[in-house]
């Protein structure tokens, strides 16, 4: 999940890497996303040497031992400091979200799971505003460690809730969601979580685990932004909404299909059963989240065209800063989902799907992913339609 997004971004040979405005990540993919948001294209110079070729698991507790079993009873075999310290020492060098914010593009949303409220937790300005905390001082390494904190392997990452010190009112979207019994369930659940943060009675500390528990594609942040929006153009600005012609979301899914031999016999090994239960929950969540996101995107496209066409032409032209002809209907949103199963070569596809999800990647698997991911994106039919749609006009 770490390498696939990286290779999809940089090996597609489409020039889109210069036009990325937002990266939303989950689990191991958050390492790639955070480093890209911090370094931009410069990450290509050293990411393979600094991370992909390293054995991160050397810094983690992975053996079965009495001491590790005791640690397991305390929440997880590894606390957050092992992975976080490795990331700071080798990759992020104590960088914070403030360092990313100063770069301005791309915006970075890292996704974890709030295991008390059973909701996604997005490391962005909106969430930290609700906690009355300062996102700009928060370490990238700690957010990444939370996003990738697989249960049992890692103890929860714990951050303090300052909600009782808030001087500002609850976010308007949260108040609206709580006051509307018909509000979307995902919006209402997150509004209730924010209410608990502010009340500070039950949640003095927010405890976070792997974002894949609640959203294994990292799409919830955008869904919440749209469902809680006050205007058709949000979370964009009016100017951005007027100037835009094309919006492309590339959803990278490094999930694997069902595998193993345990379904061939009557009996089921306990470890296989535990893994199957986890995979079932995650895969069902992935399907539902993606379908909801795709439907929301179509609806947003229609709403935004309608809003643009109702704007006074003088106001639109003032925001364009150009004399080019403007067509209010010239706006299209696209979503492209990239998966291993889209690899046409069955032999290569089988090898890709067998790559284990670990913090240690064998050299042959690195080479396989580097050769495959960009090619998968280029062959994707939805992506080809997007490129063909704009090949004579440029991408905006």
Model-derived features with residue positions:
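Solvent-exposed loop/turn segments at secondary-structure junctions
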Residues: 1, 28-31, 38-40, 114-118, ...
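Stable alpha-helical elements in mature extracytoplasmic
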Residues: 1, 16-19, 28, 32, ...
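Short, small-residue-biased leader/transition segments that mark boundaries at the very start
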Residues: 2-9
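C-terminal helical/tail subdomains of lipid-metabolizing enzymes
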Residues: 9, 192-194, 198-226, 230-396
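Patatin-like phospholipase
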Residues: 10-77, 81, 124-132, 371
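Extracellular/periplasmic catalytic domains that process cell-envelope and extracellular macromolecules
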Residues: 16, 40, 79-80, 100-104, ...
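Active-site gating loop/helix substructures
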Residues: 60-74, 85, 102-225
